[in-house]
Structure formats: structure tokens, C-alpha cells
Amino acid sequence: MEIMDSGEPFLQWDKNLSELSEAGENDILYSTHFTDLLDDLSQEALLGQLLSDPFLSGRGDAMDTEEELTRASPVPPHIQAEHSYSLCGDSRPQSPLSHLPGEPGSDAADSESDEWPMEQEDKGIKMEPLLCVPLPALTLTVTPAGSAPEPVIDSCDSAQSLSLPQVKEDSNSPQIKLEPHEVDQFLNLSPKGLECLQMPPTPPSSVGSDSEGSQSPVHPCAPASPTQTPAVLKVAPRAPSSLSSSPLLTAPHKLQGSGPLLLTEEEKRTLIAEGYPVPTKLPLSKAEEKALKKIRRKIKNKISAQESRRKKKEYVDALEKKVETCSNENHELRRKVENLECTNKSLLQQLHSLQAVVAGKVPRSCRVTGTQTSTCLMVVVLCFSLFLGSFYPGLSPCSSITKADLSREISIHDSYTTTVKSRSLLSIQEPGGLDEPHPIGLGGEYPEWDRQADVMAAWRFEQQHKEEEAELHKAEHRPLLLSTNETHAQKAILIDLHTHRSNETAKVIQLDRTVNETS
């Protein structure tokens, strides 16, 4: 804004700020001229107030001046903080007659006192909610013309800088030129201060661009091109910072005041692509300002989208590297598993071979052990039977044979002593004929001649063989002397019977021979 002395002592308000409102909001307009509100103040008084308290003096004078200025003016509405090309969170205007946000007296409670009237006949200010976000501490400089010193006030946490409007004084015609650092406080941030602000890693809708609620409706006087050709932006990767420091956007302080307007190539290209005229002079008209806001918003959205794509690409690259490392580890683990499987197979083969060898050896030993066990059992049983046989001769298998032998000897002695009986027996057998063999009589009288009984009794008679032979020789001589007139068959039978006791095989052969001879 400018306040110029043009011959008559009155103040003139710049129209750059007043044209920010919409045309259809005439119900909340202020028809009172800004100069009418300041009629009671002269140029000298206003100059004294500007050079006195707001930045150099104490807080009390500034409060008094503010009360005097705001006592006669109605309460204006607040302006929303974020517009198309604003990056500031504070919606209060920049004015030398109001408190700065960094001063102790300016806070959310004093927001009603930070008011400023505007010169407007048929236009008003759009009522929008206030975002109570205070600015960081500021560094303020006052630069008067001539040889006046330059007082500088540094706050404790100076992160942003604002240049105080320059005051030019002449002896004859004093001219006061008030040039805020930016068009309104919507554009008040310097590149140095913005370096401290880091752009959050969020989608493009939250990086310094206007929200949908704060966008002004598009007037038909600014037609858009039916074929939009979006410009391809190539921005080198950079550290997260505010979009206002981008070389694709014009600095906000260059959009204020009057004079030639220098836009960036990207802004010019976007304006031409959208079908808007390229502004070259300041101040901007309402249509030019709306078009500039629109294309600046689009450029910021493009920049934020590129930043988002860059971050996404970095994230995807990191994930790809991680996947590659994981795949390499997986391949190594697969190789190890294959080696372990091969080792396991070889060990299983060795185990099966060892089991086969052990299975081949175990049955042989078991067979040997079984044979030895059966042999031992048979030997034990035999010894036990012999032991019992020696103690109990009546239970031995040869006891019946012995008894039969004794009865045979008794019968033989009886037959030889009583020759008449034997003759009668022989005479009884004679009618049957001597031609037929008579084995039944032999078996009945001498049951001990059976082959099995003789075999079992042979080993019992070995010790008594000599005694029996002597007795047999005596018995043989007796029948020869007593019965000399007996038949040849009877003698042969008796001889064969006595010789059978000495030799078992000879008995059977001689018995058959005698039977054949009789036949």
C-alpha cells in the first residue's frame, strides 16, 4: 500500500488488498472511505506515530495509538490464512499501526484489535474463520532515507525477517511510502526463514496449497482453456523445504506494490497453457490476481507431487534393495538345505548298510546259541536219566529184560531137569510135523529174543558173559547125555538157543537155519 502526498493532506489506500474479496458479498461491505476514518489525523501525526512506538518504543504508546485508530472504525472480519500463493499461517494483515505477532501484546486474545479498514465502495471482504497460528519470532529493520540511523530490533528467536516500510521525508513536500514486505501477510515469509521450516512428508494436498474450502469461485470473466497442456517439471532432488523457495515460483514480495511484474518461466507457461493473459505490471487486477493464484496453486501442487513421487521412488528403491538381500539370503539357505539333504541321504544309506550287516550276523549267533542250548539240554537229560537208573534199577528199561532172562533160565533148568516134560512137549509138537516152522512157540517161551530187547540188553550182559558161557556149557552137556535118543531138530534148537546168548546176530541166523532144516 502507498500513502503519498499529492498536494492535499489526505491518505490514499492501495487497492491491491481491497480486491482480494469476492464481488458477490456486498452485504458485508464497508462503504466508509479509509480517508474519512483518518480525517482527524494529520500527516505529521501519522508520521510521528509510525516512527514512534510500534517498533522502537514501549507497548503502551502503541496500544494508545491503536485504540485511537480503531475507536472510530467498525470491526472488520477476519481473513483466512491460506490462499493460493500464501505460505504463512497467520491471517492478520501487515500494518505499521498494528501489533506484530511476535510482540508480547499480540496473541490470540488480541486478534480482535488487529483490524484494518479498507477503501471499498462496491466490494467487501469475505468472512472466513481465523487460524490462530502465531508467527515465529521476527527480525525487524527500519530503513529511513537520508542519514538517519538504522535501528534494528532482534527478537530472542529470530527466524524470519520483515523489512519495515521505508519512510521518505522531504523538507518541502514530505512523501511517506509504506511498502510492506509482502502484499498481505499471506505472503510474509523470507527464504532464510523458510529454510527453518521443513515440509512434512504428506500428500500434495497438505504441502502449502489451498484447501478446497478456501478456494474462491472462478468467475466467467477468466475462461479456462479447453485443452490444458500440463508442463513437465524437472526438479532436482532437494532437501524438504517450503515451496516458496522454489525457482519455479515468483517471490511473494515481488507481487506487491507497483511497477513491472517479473514472473518465472513456469508461471508464464502455465498461464498461457490455461488461457490466461500474462500480467506484466503491478498492481494486479482482480482477474489477474485470481488467475495468478490459480496457476501458482497448480505449480505448487506439481512440485509437491514431484516431491511425493521422489520420496515414493526412494522408498521403493529401498524396498527393492531389501527384497534383493532377502532373495540372496534365501538362495544361500536353499543351498545349505540341499547340502544337508545330501548329507542326510548318505548317512541314511550308511545306516541301512550297517543294519544289514548287523542283521546278517545276529541270526548265525542265535543259531549257534540255539544248537548249543539244545545239546546242553540233551546232555543234562541223559545224565539225569543215568543218575536215576543207577539209584533205581527197577525203573531202568532193562529191568523187564532181566526178569525175563531169569525166568528163561529157570524154565531152561526145569526143562533139563525134568526130561519127561520136555519129551511130552516134543511129542505134542511132533503131530504138527517138523516140516512147518513154529516161531510162535519160540516167541512165547522166549520173549526176550525179540530184536529190540536183545539190543537194549546186550550192553547189560557184557560183564556176565563169561559166567553165562560157563553155565551154558554145563547145560549143553546135560541134554546130550540124558537124551541121546532125541531128534536132530531138538538138539539143533537147544544149541541155537544157548549160542544166541553169546552173539546176537548169530542167534538169528542159526534160528532161521534150524527152521529151514526142520522144514
From Swiss-Prot:
Q: Single Gene Ontology BP term?
A: response to endoplasmic reticulum stress
Recorded hits in PROSITE patterns, A to Z, give: BZIP, BZIP_BASIC
User: What's the PTM story here?
Assistant: Upon ER stress, translocated to the Golgi apparatus, where it is processed by regulated intramembrane proteolysis (RIP) to release the cytosol-facing N-terminal transcription factor domain. The cleavage is performed sequentially by site-1 and site-2 proteases (S1P/mbtps1 and S2P/mbtps2).
Specify the protein's topology with respect to the membrane. Answer: Single-pass type II membrane protein
- Gene3D superfamilies linked to this entry: 1.20.5.170
One cellular component term (GO) for this entry is:
nucleus
Q: Could you tell me which Pfam families the record lists for this protein? A: bZIP_1
Q: What family does the Swiss-Prot or TrEMBL record give for this protein?
A: Belongs to the bZIP family. ATF subfamily.
What is the protein's given name? Cyclic AMP-responsive element-binding protein 3-like protein 2
- What organism, scientifically named, is this protein from? Danio rerio
Q: Mind giving the lineage of the organism this protein is from?
A: Eukaryota, Metazoa, Chordata, Craniata, Vertebrata
Tell me what gene encodes this. Answer: creb3l2
